[in-house]
């Protein structure tokens, strides 16, 4: 991710931030997220690490496979989409289809975290991320295209959950107020 995008991300909460707020992120604790949002510092690992490298390299390939398997054309949208209702929430989507679905691309080394293909049985942190994206965009369905262990391609489908989105809004508001108040 480029430096300007990382600076822009400090102005609000994105999908991966939501899992951290709930304490479900593998990558960041709520405290680390708070420090990230309240300082101007950009961590080196946010700019480049193996996961970012491989994710960026494989994303277009996974999207091509997604299009081939579903028949849905997936295109990269604007880098950051800000919520019209909650001005501190944004989404950085991997793709949007020609039929109004979000497509989230993942790579994973652990197949046991993923349920039956076609279901919504995916890791909790990704459920939060995806519900956040649907909350920000107003879209109702997200397809998850995941490449597991380098050769196992699977598709999952998650529908908007208004109850969970309401919980996300409440926790995000509380967290963002702490960021604004520096408390």
Q: Where on the chain are the PLM-derived regions?
A:
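Charged, glycine-rich intrinsically disordered N-terminal tails and low-complexity linkers that flank
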Residues: 1-61
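Nucleic-acid nuclease catalytic cores
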Residues: 52, 68-176, 180
């Amino acid at each position: 991710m480029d430096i300007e995008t990382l600076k822009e991300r400090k102005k609000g909460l994105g999908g991966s931030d939501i899992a951290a707020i709930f304490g479900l992120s593998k990558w960041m604790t709520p405290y680390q997220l708070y420090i990230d949002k309240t300082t101007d510092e950009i961590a080196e690992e946010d700019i480049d690490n193996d996961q970012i490298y491989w994710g960026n390299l494989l994303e277009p390939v996974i999207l091509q496979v997604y299009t081939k398997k579903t028949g849905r054309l997936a295109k990269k949208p604007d880098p950051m989409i800000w919520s019209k209702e909650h001005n501190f929430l944004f989404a950085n989507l991997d793709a949007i289809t020609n039929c109004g679905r979000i497509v989230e691309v993942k790579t994973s080394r652990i197949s046991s975290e993923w349920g039956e293909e076609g279901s919504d049985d995916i890791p909790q942190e990704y459920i939060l991320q995806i519900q956040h994206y649907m909350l920000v965009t107003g879209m109702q369905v997200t397809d998850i295209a995941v490449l597991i262990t380098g050769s196992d391609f699977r598709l999952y489908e998650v529908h908007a959950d208004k109850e969970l989105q309401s919980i996300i809004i409440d926790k995000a508001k509380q967290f963002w107020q702490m960021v604004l108040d520096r408390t």
